[in-house]
């Protein structure tokens, strides 16, 4: 193949993705812009191949599946104190607070469908607040789950890290994906991108050391 043909076949990365390493090295948000969906999906693909029933993705914060949530004995033995069900409801993972009523577990349900048209963003802040409140106690341990532990639950954990840990979407994806194989659907990725843009804008306006924003 001629060199000219080779050049024309090269696909250039999203311009925002080219800035990611620079932003990470400098610890600055000034050069950061939210990557497109394809570039974000590539970050998930580069992540951990681990896909067990449950994985710790942040200290005392675990993402898991339906089997983990239904295993009352396993939850108690593992020391879980909080459960966030991102697939709450009769036609999803039908647990609820009554399922754990005789256990020392605090429950929070989000009735969400794993389809691109579902607006999960309306639950971002309430779910993030529940996770953050749980982790205020050094002895607590929270499970965030859906049916498979890949899309709905992962999306809410990413939103938590962005809102309460001041991470960009890229930082949050890298943190979660290095510990568990996850991949939110395209609709949820779009909603996370919008959250990322809002938070980055707010942090730039607030300046350094502003702490948690968007609350």
Curated annotation (Swiss-Prot):
Top-level taxon in the UniProt lineage: Eukaryota
Record keywords: Cytoplasm, Hydrolase, Nucleus, Protein phosphatase
Domain Tyrosine-protein phosphatase stretches: 53-201
UniProt enzyme class: hydrolase
A GO CC term assigned to this protein in UniProt: nucleus
Documented EC number(s): 3.1.3.16, 3.1.3.48
Pfam family, one: DSPc
Catalytic activity from the UniProt record: O-phospho-L-tyrosyl-[protein] + H2O = L-tyrosyl-[protein] + phosphate; O-phospho-L-seryl-[protein] + H2O = L-seryl-[protein] + phosphate; O-phospho-L-threonyl-[protein] + H2O = L-threonyl-[protein] + phosphate
Chain positions recorded as substrate binding sites: 145-152
Active-site positions on this chain: 146
GO terms of biological process kind: glucose homeostasis; muscle cell differentiation; negative regulation of ERK1 and ERK2 cascade; negative regulation of MAPK cascade; protein dephosphorylation
GO MF term set: MAP kinase phosphatase activity; protein homodimerization activity; protein serine/threonine phosphatase activity; protein tyrosine phosphatase activity; protein tyrosine/serine/threonine phosphatase activity
Role: Dual specificity phosphatase able to dephosphorylate phosphotyrosine, phosphoserine and phosphothreonine residues within the same substrate, with a preference for phosphotyrosine as a substrate. Involved in the modulation of intracellular signaling cascades. In skeletal muscle regulates systemic glucose homeostasis by activating, AMPK, an energy sensor protein kinase. Affects MAP kinase signaling though modulation of the MAPK1/2 cascade in skeletal muscle promoting muscle cell differentiation, development and atrophy.
Subunit structure: Homodimer. Interacts with PRKAA2.
Family designation: Belongs to the protein-tyrosine phosphatase family. Non-receptor class dual specificity subfamily.
Protein name: Dual specificity phosphatase 29
Species whose genome carries this gene: Rattus norvegicus
Lineage, opening ranks: Eukaryota, Metazoa, Chordata, Craniata, Vertebrata
